[in-house]
Amino acid sequence: MTSKPHSDWIPYSVLDDEGSNLRQQKLDRQRALLEQKQKKKRQEPLMVQANADGRPRSRRARQSEEQAPLVESYLSSSGSTSYQVQEADSLASVQPGATRPPAPASAKKTKGAAASGGQGGAPRKEKKGKHKGTSGPATLAEDKSEAQGPVQILTVGQSDHAKDAGETAAGGGAQPSGQDLRATMQRKGISSSMSFDEEEDEDENSSSSSQLNSNTRPSSATSRKSTREAASAPSPAAPEPPVDIEVQDLEEFALRPAPQGITIKCRITRDKKGMDRGMYPTYFLHLDREDGKKVFLLAGRKRKKSKTSNYLISVDPTDLSRGGDSYIGKLRSNLMGTKFTVYDNGVNPQKASSSTLESGTLRQELAAVCYETNVLGFKGPRKMSVIVPGMNMVHERVCIRPRNEHETLLARWQNKNTESIIELQNKTPVWNDDTQSYVLNFHGRVTQASVKNFQIIHGNDPDYIVMQFGRVAEDVFTMDYNYPLCALQAFAIALSSFDSKLACE
């Protein structure tokens, strides 16, 4: 058998050499890429690269549109990619020190596009918080799974399903359960320690629904709570349930303390008409009802030919004489007009006989009012102290029937004998630069400034308004009082504010 000349098989050897050179060049390029990637990894060992497959899909339509070409590119180049992946595996066996095979050209290009779209290449910014991508352990587990085996193209096909699932969840449809996702991820070699967006979304939905339920509380519960708070809070600023006060007996109502937790709202009108009404006007007290009607309670007028200011108070607006049957009490001041005492219709102890002293018909002292000038001088607000009898265990007024000057309310207060008495004071007003006046918060019940406006409080509870009085028109005033005052006490205190005070004007 004769051998062929060399010229017959030389061309075949040339083709073989060219094919081997091409393969060698391709291997050299891939080896260079692998060494470059390893060098980059050694330079940045702590950097965790963004993973386009493991990163949670945002439910925005813009990101879904950006992810759509990724699926098409992978599907269109699946054949060549599979071939290059096999070559990468063979190259990984040649390089024993490699920890991660080089990504194929098409896959690398597509992953680079996805990474640039997820990090700094696009103007789109990721939200801080739980949508930061996968956590550290999940990403490291993916790197380990890719180093142990070939790159799985199925993870790209998964993105289309994940995108559809994300759009369904955003549209309010049924979301895939966390167990199915865990099974799929474990089947693909992804760590199960990854946090699921579905579970977090359920937590968000539950928290938002609970917040919505707390914001949209039933009106009945809110109203019940506000009613209880209004009943417990003594301040008239708190909303109170509308209560119609029934007045059967005027004299009994005028002497009965106000119910606890209820503010008695009244109105005082001043009548200056007539020959001497300018000097001695008549004052009428009416009860303001919730239905807008007014109920007459008391009337008072300053007596003529009296050494000191002396106001008679009656339950009959047409009979203001001391000897009448409607006479219920009086208000009397000292010579300077700074100290006032409120009495009922009892007998004066100085004019009473021995039998009268023992019969218990002596007059009671219901209140004492003391006015003083403020530290700012005569132009400042007046300082006001109110002394009333104390209350017993059954919320009844303690009877104080003094037989001499040493047993009066003013004497007890001046001697610091606070047994069986309650000391009240006016609330200090605040200077307002806008109105250039001293103001108090009357919660809409007083509309005009006046030196006669005041609020009575207790020193231990400044938020509890025992009584307030103020002007709303030329001859119209509002008067609101609370426990432990009665209508006669409050009306007499208001009358003391009308009277002129030589030492305080």
UniProtKB/Swiss-Prot annotation:
Organism domain of life: Eukaryota
tRNA processing as UniProt keyword: no
Residue span of region Disordered: 35-243
One GO MF term attached to the UniProt entry: protein-containing complex binding
Biased composition, class Low complexity, residue ranges: 70-87, 206-220
Cellular-component GO terms for this entry: cilium; cytoplasm; cytosol; extracellular region; nucleus; plasma membrane
A Pfam cross-reference name: Tub
SUPFAM superfamilies: Tubby C-terminal domain-like (SSF54518)
Protein name, per record: Tubby protein homolog
Natural source organism: Rattus norvegicus (Rat)
Lineage, opening ranks: Eukaryota, Metazoa, Chordata, Craniata, Vertebrata
